[in-house]
């Protein structure tokens, strides 16, 4: 049961970080070719 909770926390943290990174990267310039993403 503990591993399930850890997996859920990892998935939630992954989606939250993905949303934050996407919002920050698309906020200043909306060009599809981002140079700072590497």
Curated annotation (Swiss-Prot):
Belongs to the PsbI family. The gene is psbI. This is Photosystem II reaction center protein I. It is found in: Cellular thylakoid membrane. NCBIfam families: PRK02655.1. Keywords: Membrane, Photosynthesis, Photosystem II, Reaction center, Thylakoid, Transmembrane, Transmembrane helix. GO terms for cellular component: photosystem II reaction center; plasma membrane-derived thylakoid membrane. One of the components of the core complex of photosystem II (PSII), required for its stability and/or assembly. PSII is a light-driven water:plastoquinone oxidoreductase that uses light energy to abstract electrons from H(2)O, generating O(2) and a proton gradient subsequently used for ATP formation. It consists of a core antenna complex that captures photons, and an electron transfer chain that converts photonic excitation into a charge separation. The chain crosses the membrane at residues 6-26. It comes from the Bacteria.
